[in-house]
A protein has these predicted regions:
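Acidic/polar active-site rim loop that often engages polyanionic ligands
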Residues: 85-88, 149-154
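Hydrophobic/aromatic-lined pockets within catalytic cores
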Residues: 49, 111, 176-180
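Short gly/ser-rich loop at a beta-strand->alpha-helix junction or flexible surface loop bordering the NTP-binding
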Residues: 69-78, 88-147
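Hydrophobic alpha-helical interaction segments
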Residues: 8, 20, 152-235
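Short beta-edge/loop segments at beta->alpha junctions of small alpha/beta modules
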Residues: 18-98
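Polybasic, lysine-rich low-complexity intrinsically disordered segments
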Residues: 10-12
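Functional cation/ligand-contacting sites centered on basic and imidazole/sulfhydryl donors
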Residues: 1
Length: 235
């Protein structure tokens, strides 16, 4: 082999490695820009317009663990590559929309109940549904459109935000979706909040009565139980 051929091959090899290094760095940069927000297949494909088969690129990214599939057509970037901590609340909002975090998940988020919650609970105007993902289990319960917007807030966490029930609305939703709970008397309320869910009573008396009143006005599920709860709060 001549010296000229040797150096030409060496240059080509160096070019190949530099090109591959640049491509990987550019790919990581594009994925980092997505951050912790769940994105659809089409959004990921749009990052690689130069490719003839961007859908194959999505499959390869998943296989190489650059992205994590939440369900068909929805992904998050692996935090090892994005450098962003994933938010189960943000994932829940995107996994089945429109929806908001509620019930025990929200009460635990606010520190109102002591027990750990292992399923991410949300409310939706769609049919009730559950999802199992590599990042946890998500459960969605139906709520009427009239009651959906009552007591729901948007919490901003740096560069993203998610919808979550206020403590009052989370309690309404939890009662509404607990089949054995029927608060007819004040003693029922006392037993439920102090013994069943063991809510922080000091924080309970700080709850906003107007949210319960608004829920009752729109005819929310188990409104009669919320009326009794409101009487207990105001006594």
């Amino acid at each position: 082999m001549s010296i000229w051929i040797y150096f030409e091959q060496k240059k080509m090899l160096q070019f190949f490695y530099y090109s591959k290094y640049y491509y990987i760095c550019n790919m990581n940069k594009l994925l980092k820009e997505i951050g912790a927000t769940p994105v659809t297949t089409s959004i990921i494909e749009s990052l690689y317009p130069e490719l003839k088969s961007p859908n194959k690129k999505v499959a390869l990214l998943e296989k190489q663990s650059y992205i994590i599939r939440l369900k068909r057509g929805l992904y998050v970037v692996n935090p090892e590559h994005s450098g962003k901590t994933l938010s189960t609340e943000l994932i829940a909002n995107h996994l089945y929309a429109p929806s908001y975090i509620s019930m025990s998940t929200a009460l635990r988020y606010y520190g109102l109940i002591p027990e750990a919650v292992y399923v991410n609970q949300s409310m939706t105007v769609k049919h009730s549904r559950s999802f199992k993902t590599p990042l946890g289990n998500y459960d969605y319960k139906y709520i009427s459109r009239e009651a959906f917007s009552v007591g729901v807030r948007s919490l901003h966490m740096g560069d993203y935000a998610f919808l979550i029930a206020s403590p009052e609305k989370a309690l309404c939703d939890l009662i509404a979706n607990s089949s054995k709970v029927n608060l007819r008397y004040l003693t029922d309320v006392e037993h439920y909040i102090e013994e069943d869910i063991r809510i922080d009573m000091e924080e309970f008396y700080k709850l906003d009565a107007t949210v319960f009143e608004d829920y009752i006005k729109v005819g929310g599920k188990k409104a009669d139980s919320i009326v009794t709860l409101l009487k207990y709060l105001k006594r």
